[in-house]
Amino acid sequence: MDSKESLAPPGRDEVPSSLLGRGRGSVMDLYKTLRGGATVKVSASSPSVAAASQADSKQQRILLDFSKGSASNAQQQQQQQQQQQQQQQQQPQPDLSKAVSLSMGLYMGETETKVMGNDLGYPQQGQLGLSSGETDFRLLEESIANLNRSTSRPENPKSSTPAAGCATPTEKEFPQTHSDPSSEQQNRKSQPGTNGGSVKLYTTDQSTFDILQDLEFSAGSPGKETNESPWRSDLLIDENLLSPLAGEDDPFLLEGDVNEDCKPLILPDTKPKIQDTGDTILSSPSSVALPQVKTEKDDFIELCTPGVIKQEKLGPVYCQASFSGTNIIGNKMSAISVHGVSTSGGQMYHYDMNTASLSQQQDQKPVFNVIPPIPVGSENWNRCQGSGEDNLTSLGAMNFAGRSVFSNGYSSPGMRPDVSSPPSSSSTATGPPPKLCLVCSDEASGCHYGVLTCGSCKVFFKRAVEGQHNYLCAGRNDCIIDKIRRKNCPACRYRKCLQAGMNLEARKTKKKIKGIQQATAGVSQDTSENANKTIVPAALPQLTPTLVSLLEVIEPEVLYAGYDSSVPDSAWRIMTTLNMLGGRQVIAAVKWAKAIPGFRNLHLDDQMTLLQYSWMFLMAFALGWRSYRQASGNLLCFAPDLIINEQRMTLPCMYDQCKHMLFISTELQRLQVSYEEYLCMKTLLLLSSVPKEGLKSQELFDEIRMTYIKELGKAIVKREGNSSQNWQRFYQLTKLLDSMHDVVENLLSYCFQTFLDKSMSIEFPEMLAEIITNQIPKYSNGNIKKLLFHQK
C-alpha cells in the first residue's frame, strides 16, 4: 500500500504541502494531527526506508515514554491488542516507515533532526533512530503495551496534545474509538492555536488518534504537577513553527508596542498578575500564558524578566514603574507606589503593590520596563525629582486611596521606624530652626543677662561674677567652647560670655526700666499735665562686652612659691625662691599678654620686645596690688605661702629692695585704686617701654595703647561718676605709672648685679636667665625709650 493512500483516506480534503514546507520535503503537522486538523500530503521526494536506514548511524535511539501521559486499565489494553492482531491479519502490511517517522515529529529529509519544544523549556525526549531492518513494529507495540500496564489513570481529565518530539501512536497500535464530532469540533475552536476547521484527517472508523480523547492528561506544567505529564495542549501556537522554511521572520518574535507592558510567564504556583484597576487575574490550568518576547525598531530586544531591569548603553534611559499603560502622574490610581529606596540626597522610597490581596506577599516584585528616551521622559523625570507644577506630587509623596496598607503593615512611610524624613523637609515641618546659645551653641532657653544663651551658661556666668573667681586658662586662651567642651576651661567660657555681651546688671536694669514705666503710667493717669512726659534712666549699662571685662577674664591666678617656713630664713634662700617664683610668673605673664585683645595683632618681634622690657613692671605692680588687697600695703605678699614681713625685711640686702616695692602698694592704698583701674594700668605698663628705633608695627602699637588709655578713663568715670574729680584722678593714676619706671629701674639694677655676681650663688630659672641676658646690653647701651604721661 502506498504511503499517500494510508495517510489520505477517501472523502477527505487535502492541504497543500506548500503550507507546511517548501523545497526540502514536508513535515507532518503533529499539532493539527492531534487536534483533528487537515490531512498531510507527503511528496514523492520523501526519503525512503533505505534512506532512513542509512541515516541510522547518525541518529540516536529514543525511548518512548507514555507512562506519565496516558493510562488505561488492563482490560482495555487486552482488547486493544486483540483488535490490532485482527487488523494485521485481515489487511496487508503497508509500508508505514515514512508515515511513522513523520508522525513522530522527525524531519527525515535531513540528518540533523529538530525536536520541537526544546526552546520553550520542555523536557527533550531524545531522537529516534530506525534501523534498516526494522519495518516490523511489534517491538514498539509490546513496549507501549508494557508501559500502559504500569500507568494509572490521573484525575481531572482534560484533553491535551503530546509534547513535540515524542513519537505518536499509529493506526495499528491503538483501536478505533468513536466520539461526538460536533463536540470535538467545538473544543478545537475554543482552544487557541488550533485549526478550528471541520476537515478531519481520518474518518470515524479509521481515525488513528481518537484514542487520545479517552486518555486523560494533566494540563499543568510537567515540572510542577505530581504526575509529571509531558503532554501539553498549547505548545505549538503558530502553524509555521513546524516548518523551518515557512517564513523569514523569527517565529519567536511577536509584535508589540514600545510602551506596552511586558508580562512575565506566570505558572500555577507563582503569584497572580495585576490589572490596571488593581484586581488579581486568576490563571486557569487550561490557559497557561507563554512568555512573550517583543521586538522593537531599536537595535535591541526587550526581554521580560520579573524583578530585572534591562539597562542599555546606547542612550539615556531610565527605569519607570509599570502601570499597565496608565501615566505615572496623570492617573492617581497607579498600580505601584514607590517609597523606601535610598537616594544620594537622603530620601528613601519603597516599592509596594497597590492591591490589598498582595499586601500579605512580602516577596512580590514590581514589574519594570525600560523606557527609551521620549519627549515626555524629561518631564516625568523632573516631576519625580520634585520640580514642576505645584499640583503634581513626586513619587515619594504619593498616597493612593486604593492602597489600604503597605507591605510592612504601616499605613504610611512616615510611620516606618527605618524610614527617615529628608533633611530638607525637617525645618519646614517643625517650623523655624531652634535658636542657639551664643556661648556654647547649645539650644538657647531664653535671653539671659542681655544675651540669648542656654540655662547652663546663664548659671555659670552668674556664679562666675558673684563668686569673683579668677579663672586661668591652661592653654592659650583660645579653647573651643561648645556643648561638649564648655566645662573644660571656665576661663575661656567666661571670656566668651563677656564677648557675647552678658552683663549681670542687665537683668536689674530691665526690672528698673519696667518699674519706672509702670510708675510713669500710674502718674500719667493721675495728672494729665505730666501725661506726655516720660522718665528715662540717666545712663543705661552697656550690654556689649568691654575691654575691661575681657581683662578680668584673662587675669592670671595667684601662684604659690612653695617656700618652707619651718626652715630658718636666709637672704639667699628667700632670693632663690623669689627667682623661681618669678620665672613661673613670667610664663603666666606671657600667656596673659597673648590673650590681651589686640596684642597678638602686633608683629611677633614686637611682642617679644615688649615682654622683655616690661616683665619687671608687671611683676612689681602685681606684687603691689596683692599687698594692697591683702595686707593694706604694709607687707609684701609675693605668694600666699611667702609673705615678707618686717622681720624678713631686716635680712641683708633685702630692705632696700623691699622699700621700693612697698612704695607701689602704699600708693595704691592711698589712691584706693579699683580693680578695673588696676587692670587698665597693668596693661598700659606692658606698653610703657619701646626701643628707641621704634617697633615694626608702631602705628598699631600706638592705636592699641591709646585704646587702653581711654579704657582707664572709662574705669575712672565708672568709679567716680560724673564729677569734676575725674581728670584729677586720671592725673594721679598716670603719675603713678610714670613713677613705676624709677622703681623698676632700681629693681633691675639689683637683679642684674645678682645675676652677674657668681659669688652670691643665687639661682635663676632658665627662661628668666635668658631674658636678663638679652636685656642687659640694651639697658647698658641706653636703647630703651620710656613712654611717660608727664614730663619731669
Swiss-Prot record:
Portion annotated as DNA-binding: 434-509
UniProt PTM: Acetylation by CLOCK reduces its binding to glucocorticoid response elements and its transcriptional activity.
Pfam families linked: GCR (PF02155), Hormone_recep (PF00104), zf-C4 (PF00105)
Single GO MF annotation: core promoter sequence-specific DNA binding
Predominant location category: cytoplasm
Phosphothreonine PTM sites in chain numbering: T168
Keyword set, alphabetical order: Acetylation, Chromatin regulator, Chromosome, Cytoplasm, Cytoskeleton, DNA-binding, Isopeptide bond, Lipid-binding, Metal-binding, Methylation, Mitochondrion, Nucleus, Phosphoprotein, Receptor, Steroid-binding, Transcription, Transcription regulation, Ubl conjugation, Zinc, Zinc-finger
InterPro entries per UniProt: Glcrtcd_rcpt, NHR-like_dom_sf, Nucl_hrmn_rcpt_lig-bd, Nuclear_hormone_rcpt_NR3, Nuclear_hrmn_rcpt, Znf_hrmn_rcpt, Znf_NHR/GATA
Biased composition (Basic and acidic residues): 1-15
Coiled coil regions in record: none
Region called Interaction with CRY1, residue ranges: 547-712
Locations listed in the record: Cytoplasm; Nucleus; Mitochondrion; Cytoplasm, Cytoskeleton, Spindle
Keyword Ubl conjugation appears in the UniProt entry: yes
Summary of the function given for this chain in its UniProt record: Receptor for glucocorticoids (GC). Has a dual mode of action: as a transcription factor that binds to glucocorticoid response elements (GRE), both for nuclear and mitochondrial DNA, and as a modulator of other transcription factors. Affects inflammatory responses, cellular proliferation and differentiation in target tissues. Involved in chromatin remodeling. Plays a role in rapid mRNA degradation by binding to the 5' UTR of target mRNAs and interacting with PNRC2 in a ligand-dependent manner which recruits the RNA helicase UPF1 and the mRNA-decapping enzyme DCP1A, leading to RNA decay.
Name under which the protein is recorded: Glucocorticoid receptor
Taxon lineage: Eukaryota, Metazoa, Chordata, Craniata, Vertebrata
